[in-house]
Design a protein with these regions (language model features):
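N-terminal nucleophile
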Residues: 1-294
């Protein structure tokens, strides 16, 4: 369960941010790979081998799950079988054209809410298996170009594909997840509409807007199997830079290997979590959240 947002900033272009939620504490790392026509930089979950990121043509991919059965599985050991979604994203990011990347994800039937963007353009893809099953049913999708005067936010329920993701009434646990997804979407949309800089965009997604942490865009948890935000990821195509803020995760990196080469094209920057403990310059609480905890 995650939050993704994107906004166009004058002078910077499109910027995408993701709050990545898991019900385990992941081991994270970064990987660069030289392909035939492009180089790719991935944010990598060492346990599941899920990945997302950018290429040196400035095309970026961030995704939030709509596959609720898979999303709720607790994964505690490393697997030799790579994440299917990660494989699809890796394959798509080998392409240099943003439309080709989007079409690759569609042809591979990537489920979820997915942002495909570069400095100039942004597309949102919602994809899911038709009601009734996973992968044995027809793949349905909708993709639209997001205009520069628009913003976009998604969590873990379908907005265009109404049946997809967490729904009310299936059972108590899924109903609670459905409430969380809709609360997080309201907060994320408020943040992306209010932010005037990329720094505000990522920082304001850490704030506590309602008392229950599970209803906030950033979720904290101490109990096992509870969803918690493990890291934030911000991709800035103009600068070919991946900003990462570890929150509840273990992260391993070699800055010299990532950023030290003379011909380096893409960059990794780590952000402090100090923002979690300060309240300076926070946006107002959205008025339409007053009923969420009732």
């Amino acid at each position: 369960m995650c939050v993704i947002v994107a906004k166009y900033f004058e002078g910077t272009g499109w910027v995408g941010v993701k709050n990545r939620d898991r019900n385990y504490v992941p081991d994270l790392s970064f990987r660069k790979k030289q392909n035939k026509n492009t180089e790719t930089l991935y944010f990598w979950d060492d346990i599941t081998q899920y990945c997302e990121g950018m290429n040196d043509s400035g095309v970026c991919v961030l995704s939030a799950s709509l596959m609720v059965l898979d999303d709720e599985k607790e994964i505690t050991v490393r697997t030799k079988t790579p994440s299917k979604d990660g494989i699809k994203i890796k394959k798509a990011l080998k392409l240099t054209d943003i439309k080709a990347v989007a079409m690759s994800l569609i042809k591979q039937k990537l489920p979820g809410c997915t942002l495909i963007f570069n400095q100039e353009d942004c597309y949102l893809l919602e994809g899911s298996w038709a009601p009734g099953g996973y992968e044995d049913k027809d793949y349905k999708y909708k993709i639209e170009k997001i205009e520069r005067d628009q913003t976009v936010a998604r969590t873990n329920h379908g907005v265009w594909l109404k049946w997809a993701g967490y729904q009310y009434g299936a059972d108590d646990n899924e109903s609670m997840s459905a409430i969380s997804s809709r609360s997080r979407l309201l907060i994320a949309q408020h943040v992306v509409d209010s932010a005037e800089t990329p720094a505000q965009l990522i920082d304001w997604l850490t704030k506590k807007y309602v008392d229950n942490w599970q209803l906030n865009a950033m979720r904290l948890a101490d109990e096992k199997k509870m969803m918690r935000t493990t890291a934030q990821l911000m991709l800035v195509p103009k600068d070919l830079t991946m900003f990462v803020r570890p929150i509840q995760s273990n992260i391993k990196f070699n800055f010299w290997k990532l950023n030290g080469a003379k011909d380096n094209k893409m960059w990794v920057e780590l952000l402090t979590n100090r923002v979690l403990h300060t309240g300076e310059d926070d946006p107002a609480i959205p008025t339409n959240l007053s009923h969420i905890e009732d």
